[in-house]
Amino acid sequence: MSSFGIGKTKEVIFSMEEGSVKMFLRGRPVPMLIPDELAPTYSLDTRSELPSSRLKLDWVYGYRGRDCRANLYLLPTGEVVYFVASVAVLYSVEEQRQRHYLGHNDDIKCLAVHPDMVTIATGQVAGTTKEGKPLPPHVRVWDSVSLSTLHVLGLGVFDRAVCCVAFSKSNGGNLLCAVDESNDHVLSVWDWAKESKVVDSKCSNEAVLVATFHPTDPSLLITCGKSHIYFWSLEGGSLSKRQGLFEKHEKPKYVLCVTFLEGGDVVTGDSGGNLYVWGKGGNRITQEVQGAHDGGVFALCALRDGTLVSGGGRDRRVVLWGSDYSKVQEVEVPEDFGPVRTVAEGRGDTLYVGTTRNSILLGSVHTGFSLLVQGHVEELWGLATHPSRAQFVTCGQDKLVHLWSSETHQPVWSRSIEDPARSAGFHPSGSVLAVGTVTGRWLLLDTETHDLVAIHTDGNEQISVVSFSPDGAYLAVGSHDNLVYVYTVDQGGRKVSRLGKCSGHSSFITHLDWAQDSTCFVTNSGDYEILYWDPVTCKQITSADTVRNVEWATATCVLGFGVFGIWPEGADGTDINAVARSHDGKLLVSADDFGKVHLFSYPCCQPRALSHKYGGHSSHVTNVAFLWDDSMALTTGGKDTSVLQWRVA
């Protein structure tokens, strides 16, 4: 027996007699069978090879409108800039091309464009590394043409997150203001090119939603948020504030947005649905538009021609106002896209609208709006790639199922279902899709018409995996009730009948792979068990020699001889959520709890194998899959709700 890396954290033991390797997760042994052809030459001391291929971020699906604002702008290059997860996206709609700024290491929360329309600032939240080291919140100033980082501000200064950022609009835009999410919501002003703080001041105990400079007077700033609006003066290195006085006007719970009109008037929109005009330089209301929206006014945008556009929350309306604050035109955003979060001026009379349901729309108040960027709204776990097309499916907590084209980057179709979804799998014909939900219900959908073909219920816990056998004759449904339900499949996936259930795991089912010849399948469970099953009898296969040399059609199980090298030292067994092997059998991609995507060579059977590592997601990466032709890999984010498409090169 030779052993490797003896230590409390993770020991790997190779037994030649048993033809197995044993690793330990949380002190629990996980024995894995070595195929006969590898056993004679296998050694734990062989160095793993880095894959010659790399991943390059190709497309980002999604937008963060749910809880961020003023984060969508059109640049002179024709690109719209916005963010999701830890990626700032520059999307050229005409060329159908994206570029990505990847300087951040956790969620981006705010974005500002410099008056030069090239320089961009983005602020991020505090994060932690895999080792538990804090990653401090900060602001990055970068060049949108070269994507190079110019300056990093505020490391060790900001607390929790940077929630607002803005450049001064006059004086060459040489100042930048930022607000953090500390208890005092500190407003700070920076000479960003020198990376030096000019001054800071406690802003408010309550949430601050906007901080901005006056367009012509660089010594004036405005902040607003929960039950306040402040007018700030910056003089001789100190900040002084005057509170906005509502006097006889209804004081709103939240002042949600602010913009400036040509004459110097300040306009605010609030949670009461009112627009207030604050006379130039003053802190008093000089005009009001009551009930401009039913529900909050979430967005304001002053247009080039001096008119004003507002966007509504509950009423989902985009309204164009004349110079006398009379309503000129209005249009409602379709309900599926959700309330308006932010509005940006496009070319001509076009507008870009970001919504709280993480969509970006393009259109005008005259013509209405159509979808430009579709996003998921809540945690995303289900991912499956089509067996013979450049398409994939995502589904999640938001009860939405999207079938995407990886080439057009748009949904081919979308449908809502009754329960939050957790898993997905295509029939080998590609004509039927299974979707597992958190309630024990699972559905079969027609992939052409997206019609419901059938609905079944197994147990009352979440269905973590739905997987058709390679020959299309069986469907295995793995549940959090520790059972795998096996169905026979007819009519190309349209008719299923329950054959039996596989009982033997003492914890919930996490992953499942079929044999290439469909004669058996293997499962992983929440307590790191690997079991093998005969679908015909639904009985466990206990003879090691029966399964040792099986060729597996896929490698999605995170525990097994071919993949155990993905586990880092000290891993606790829940750190890696998903793994996928390329169809050509050369690459393996893993998705972890630290926002990272790793690319390994396959088989990955040396302890702590070498990998290329990629950021972009900002919370746990929940799933990973290769497109049918291995040209792209796809990863899904948990809390960041994004889908990242990686080119394999």
Curated annotation (Swiss-Prot):
InterPro entries: Beta-prop_EML-like_2nd (IPR055442), Beta-prop_EML_1st (IPR055439), HELP (IPR005108), Quinoprotein_ADH-like_sf (IPR011047), WD40/YVTN_repeat-like_dom_sf (IPR015943), WD40_rpt (IPR001680), WD_repeat_EMAP (IPR050630). It is found in: Cytoplasm, Cytoskeleton; Cytoplasm, Cytoskeleton, Spindle. Coiled coil: none annotated. Its main location: cytoplasm. Gene3D superfamilies: YVTN repeat-like/Quinoprotein amine dehydrogenase. GO terms for cellular component: cytoplasm; microtubule; mitotic spindle. Tubulin binding protein that inhibits microtubule nucleation and growth, resulting in shorter microtubules. Interacts with GRID2 and may also interact with GRID1. Interacts with EML3. Binds unpolymerized tubulins via its WD repeat region. Residues 10-649 are annotated as: Tandem atypical propeller in EMLs. One of its GO terms (biological process) is negative regulation of microtubule polymerization. Belongs to the WD repeat EMAP family. It comes from the Eukaryota. SMART domains: WD40. Contains a tandem atypical propeller in EMLs (TAPE) domain. The N-terminal beta-propeller is formed by canonical WD repeats; in contrast, the second beta-propeller contains one blade that is formed by discontinuous parts of the polypeptide chain. GO terms for molecular function: microtubule binding; tubulin binding. This is Echinoderm microtubule-associated protein-like 2. Keywords: Coiled coil, Cytoplasm, Cytoskeleton, Microtubule, Repeat, WD repeat. WD repeats lie at residues 56-93, 97-144, 151-192, 195-234, 241-280, 285-323, 369-406, 410-447, 452-489, 495-535, 564-602, 609-648. It comes from Mus musculus.
